[in-house]
């Protein structure tokens, strides 16, 4: 997918999943996502975000994937890991509420993995590659088709929002930028990335000066 925005904006988007409740209200989100607090941890070369949405209503796509009833509640998880320069891995899923998913028992639900690989093209455009994998109901092709369609639709919504965000930033009237608690993981990732870029540029400058 081609993104009309800086690659860092997409990294921030993937590390701040409370936007699911607003940008993806008809595809991936419920209001409960934005209401729950997330935890994040910064490692030496990664940032990991974890959010549990406990005892929450199940939205349409998860109903189909997990075989849940429309009025059932589920415990949802979102585990997101960023590794430099621009790889974001997601482990997401849901299980029937209060059946032990938070303690590691996912037998009453399902989960899937998502890989996002982002390649800068220019300061204001990027290439977005993604892949999805699952280990449940693997013989049902309609699930693969639904995954592709739903994911592409959701990511297209992201592309639209980020393009508008880039356009707004290009006006030069968006400073100062306001960050909120949900931005914590994204801020840590971008800070780590900026330090790495600065170090790489310094090394290149030193090498050039030595020639």
Which stretches of residues belong to each language-model region?
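C-terminal catalytic domain of Rieske-type non-heme iron oxygenases
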Residues: 1-211
């Amino acid at each position: 997918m081609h993104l009309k925005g800086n690659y860092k904006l997409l990294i921030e988007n993937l590390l701040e999943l409370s936007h699911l409740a607003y940008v993806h209200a008809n595809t991936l989100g419920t209001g409960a996502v934005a209401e729950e607090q997330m935890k994040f941890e910064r490692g030496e070369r990664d940032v990991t975000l974890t959010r549990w949405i406990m005892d929450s209503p199940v939205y349409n796509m998860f109903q189909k994937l997990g075989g849940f009833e429309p009025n059932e509640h589920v415990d949802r998880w979102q585990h997101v890991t960023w590794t430099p320069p621009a790889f974001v891995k997601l482990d997401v899923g849901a299980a029937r509420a209060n059946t032990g998913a938070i303690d590691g028992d996912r037998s009453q639900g399902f989960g899937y993995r998502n890989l996002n690989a982002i390649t800068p093209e220019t300061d204001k455009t990027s290439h977005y590659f993604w892949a999805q994998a699952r280990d449940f109901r693997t013989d049902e092709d309609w699930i693969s088709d639904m995954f592709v369609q739903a994911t592409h639709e959701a990511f297209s919504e992201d592309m639209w929002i980020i393009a508008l965000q880039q356009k707004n930033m290009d006006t030069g009237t968006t400073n100062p930028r306001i960050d909120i608690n949900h931005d914590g993981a994204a801020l840590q990732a971008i800070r780590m990335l900026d330090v790495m870029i600065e170090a790489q540029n310094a090394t290149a400058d030193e090498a050039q000066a030595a020639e």
